[in-house]
Swiss-Prot record:
Protein task: Probable vacuolar iron transporter that may be involved in the regulation of iron distribution throughout the plant.
One Gene Ontology cellular component: membrane
Highest taxon in the source lineage: Eukaryota
Residues annotated as transmembrane: 11-31, 39-59, 98-118, 125-145, 160-180
Keyword list, A-Z: Ion transport, Iron, Iron transport, Membrane, Transmembrane, Transmembrane helix, Transport, Vacuole
Any GO BP: intracellular manganese ion homeostasis
Name of the protein this chain belongs to: Vacuolar iron transporter homolog 2
Localization (cell): Vacuole membrane
Catalytic activity: Fe(2+)(in) = Fe(2+)(out)
Amino acid sequence: MARAQWLRAAVLGANDGLVSVASLMIGIGAVNENNKAMLVSGLAGLVAGACSMAIGEFVSVYAQYDIEVTQIERDGDIDGADAAAAREKLPSPTQAAFASALAFAIGGLLPLLTSGFIKPWGPRVGVVCAASSVGLAGFGAAGGYLGGANMVRSGTRVLLGGWLAMLITYAVLRLFATIFHGMNISSSA
């Protein structure tokens, strides 16, 4: 049971990394056609997202750990050896943080590595979308499998959700670029 929960969390973390980094790269691509801008924004999103996921997971798991340790200590009918064994079974906040950061980074690497070094703007954005679509469908199907749900339905749901996130990010930043056209935000300087 615990293994399935870790695997499911890893799939969700990888999906989050993929959607976040791909959406960020596509959003930057909406306002700046420079390949370096997309690459740097994707890398920044990957690092920031992995750190954020790790810190959030560490805090969350540590809070749960503290609650469970306090409960173990309150239970007077557990002797010292049983209490120590119960503590050892609790999840490690450090391991959870590392796993969360790693999962996010793995997902975020997909759009970054498949498109970050393509110079022409159109093919670069197309590769981000295509690689991300394959990853989203795969992560969704894997999540469905691990959760005992229909893999096709789960893969489709994750794919559509990812497309929606990328579309909204592109549209909002494109609108921003149109409104603030005089600010010259798409220069490569």
